[in-house]
Amino acid sequence: MKKIAIFDVCDTLYNVNTTFSFLNYYFKKHKNYLIFRKIIRLFPIKAINYLYYKFFGKDLIRIIGTFFLKNHNQSDIAKSSNIFVRNILSKEVKEKIFIKLKYYKKQGYYIVLMSGSYDFIIKEVANYFDANSYYASETQIINQLYTGRYKKDILMSKYNLFLKNFLQFEKLAVITNNKSDLKLLKLADYAYAVCNKKSDLRFWKHYSKINCIEDF
């Protein structure tokens, strides 16, 4: 049986959301995308997205943002993802979490990255950190072109994904900032919640077996 350490990626391994960081990087000169970025900063739009996420478990802004990938070539996205991870994301690594990753790797744990971010990004992130495997949201591709839609979105299904792929394990460590990963954290022998703001501490203090890693 394996000793497994699961690491979330966005706002856990990195200081940023990798989905929108990549979109901002890739479409930095795209007029319509820049307009979209301004619109989603408006409070009414944020409120609608929050309610949609709360009731339906879907990030509407994220879904709409993904439409911008439509008709972009798979190989171009792959090349840009590699550059993005090496040159941009490398400056956003959370040192405290990177130390945890190196520790569990040294202890012989099987390192798994689980993220709702795009698969083409997390593939490069897994290579960068030398992770053993990764799970991410799959983007749909037809004839080597992105359709702007998700083939499989794992944003809210990490717990079920883990149970499906790892039926037996000796020890489990989970490191994430996501409150939606609570069930996965409760399953872990070693559970760490990354607290990026003080309000996160208030949430996690109710769970005595979950250790908070302050990063604010």
Task: State where each predicted segment sits.
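Generic structural signal for well-ordered secondary structure
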Residues: 15-19, 57-58, 155
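Active-site neighborhood of HAD-like aspartate-dependent phosphohydrolases
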Residues: 1-52
